[in-house]
Amino acid sequence: MNQERVFKVLLGPHVSEKATVLADKKGQFVFKVATDATKLEIKKAVESLFSVKVERVTTLNVLGKSKRTARGLGKRNDWKKAVISLQPGQDLDFSSSAE
């Protein structure tokens, strides 16, 4: 996988109450990813960007909500979420990768 694709696969961390509990208790981290990204691409992107070993990648497609607007019904965009499980002894630190 080329370097350009690595940066397009991971769109950013997904911060929610459930994602925080997963990170604290199980060592799993949640990312927003490109909708066309595969599990293998996500695994390689996380391993190359954060220098960690990934044990498992679980993905799910999140459907956008229907919202009412002044012009009728609208719909938010669908997006893809990936839950990354790291191998035992590994930890992912977002602050050190930004420096």
Curated annotation (Swiss-Prot):
Domain of life of the organism encoding this protein: Bacteria
User: Gene3D superfamilies recorded for this chain?
Assistant: 3.30.70.330
Q: Which GO terms describe its cellular component?
A: ribonucleoprotein complex; ribosome
Record's keyword annotation contains Membrane: no
Tell me which UniProt keywords the record has, alphabetically. Answer: Ribonucleoprotein, Ribosomal protein, RNA-binding, rRNA-binding
Any single Pfam family the record assigns to this protein: Ribosomal_L23
Question: Which GO biological process entries does UniProt record here?
Answer: translation
Its quaternary organisation is:
Part of the 50S ribosomal subunit. Contacts protein L29, and trigger factor when it is bound to the ribosome.
What family classification does the UniProt entry report for this protein?
Answer: Belongs to the universal ribosomal protein uL23 family.
Q: What is this protein called?
A: Large ribosomal subunit protein uL23
| Taxonomic source organism | Pseudomonas syringae pv. tomato (strain ATCC BAA-871 / DC3000)
